[in-house]
Amino acid sequence: MENLFFDTFDGNKIFYRKWNFEKDKKTLIIIHRGHEHSERLNILTQDEKFLKYNIFAYDLRGHGYTKIKSSPNSMDYVRDLDSFVKHIKSEYQIKEEDIFIIANSIGGVILSAYVHDFAPNIAGIALLAPAFEIKLYIPFAKQLVTLLTKIKKDAKVMSYVKAKVLTHDIEEQNKYNSDKLINKEINAKLLIDLADMGKRLVEDSMAIELPTIIFSAEKDYVVKNSAQKKFFLNLSSKKRKFIELENFYHGIIFEKERQKVYKMLDDFIQDVFKNQNTTLDVSPREFSRKEYERTALKEYPLTEKIFYSIQKFSMRTFGFLSKGISLGLKYGFDSGISLDYIYKNQANGKLLIGKFIDRFYLNQIGWRGVRERKKNLLSLIEEKINSLDEKNVKILDVAGGTGNYLFDIKEKYPKIKILINEFKKSNIEVGEEVIKKNNWENISFIDYDCFDKETYKKINYTPNIVIISGVFELFENNKMLENTISGIAEILNKNGAVIYTGQPWHPQLKQIALVLNSHKGNGKSWLMRRRSEKELDSLFEKYNLKKEKMLIDNNGIFTVSLAEMR
């Protein structure tokens, strides 16, 4: 066993261990449960069944020898896992498809979010008593903890879990009780955030396609088995197993009869590695397509239809008081002009009540995500520009709206060339006015069909950065997307990159479709088909554009990815 550190996404260092390392062996990553640390995993890593694997594990933030404090955002733990996978791939020349990941309890939530949101091409996953929903024994416990976070920003709560409800093994109970590195505290906001993440993953596990095995402890006094079963039943994985372990407690790895779990786990891992499916699937995912069709046909209970009809009526009646709602009603809530207003995030309206309505509107979770998407988009664009010679940078945005974030780039990097394709005349007029006002050169608009493959030959332009932002989810048909992707792949400079956004999950899809109008005009609804990150990445991969980096907001709504030609 070696003790090491890696740099995570935010520049902090995280402690990790490696066992049994030899080149060309298959690799396991193990994520420990909350409150614990990676050294406790020795019990599994040194078992003879697992000596044939390279094994890596790290101490989560706020745990063990990792010095960083706990983060209140559960997505930071998912980003850490993404950073760790990238690190061991680079440091040890390990292929992504040769990695299998095992996670216990809270670690299972982190791992599930990683495969759902980042869609890595790993071999498979094992979830041991995943904590999608924690058992709360005090009435209104979640509400009380939420209130505590409002009163005290860095509030902590103590775990009620005792060693005697983790394992029947007395020796393991004693080890747990005497381990000074075990931390019984947990950040209160993180506890709430993990609960919300667990709920999201259970409801949307259809987006997960990897081989998955779940071990559920029959006598689990810490988490609810019902959530694990619902998660399993929704999975799209063709290879999956759910095993309920009779008389087992929550700490499955440390239980008395752990050897039978180790055997089943090893058998599953070997089978996965032996029968890996590397076929690229670019077909529309059935769950997403059906969700889109149900929304388009408005096939919802009458109570929901009435509820959203009231919202729509209220918005059309009183929306004029809010500047943001007024712009949405006039130009479409998904229009470039509407998004410009969202980005500014400055409440405006008629009278005090108008400003109040506008602030409520701007604070909606979807709009907060859109603003975060812009930040992430700018971050990846700047990262790519800085890897190139500024004066030789040529950017193409296939559907750039008014050019909002591109103007931020032009202001910071005046030497670059920017071409903005946009079909909406009102957006072009707004954008051209900004260009004229700033006396910018080498930035202009064109008006072509971004879904016509021939467009990209006609423009006679060889970009080294292509941007596709906020457009693909507006169209259901994957063939249209392939026309765009294949077209840009043909003209992209060999050292170039495509930066594209995704929307793997959105809590307001139904509300948006039934209440808000689109930029397409004639009162058409703002209807979207979200795509799982796996589906979206596969469409780019088909044309040899391989995702190298991805950023995501804390709520898991919008992704921004950078792909390069293989």
Could you tell me what each predicted segment is?
Residues H35-H37, G64-Y92:
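Catalytic nucleophile-loop/oxyanion-hole region of alpha/beta-hydrolase
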Residues S322-N386:
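Class I SAM-dependent methyltransferase Rossmann-like catalytic core
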Residues I208, I214-S216:
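Short beta-strand/loop motif that positions the catalytic acidic residue
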Residues T402-P414:
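Conserved SAM-binding loop of SAM-dependent methyltransferases across substrates and taxa
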Residues T45-K67:
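Conserved alpha/beta-hydrolase
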Residues I243-Y292:
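Catalytic active-site module of serine/aspartate enzymes centered on a nucleophile-bearing elbow/loop
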Residues N495-G502:
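Conserved beta-strand signature within the Rossmann-like core of class I S-adenosyl-L-methionine
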Residues E482-K494:
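A short glycine-rich, Lys/Arg-flanked "PGG" loop and its adjoining helix->strand segment in the class I
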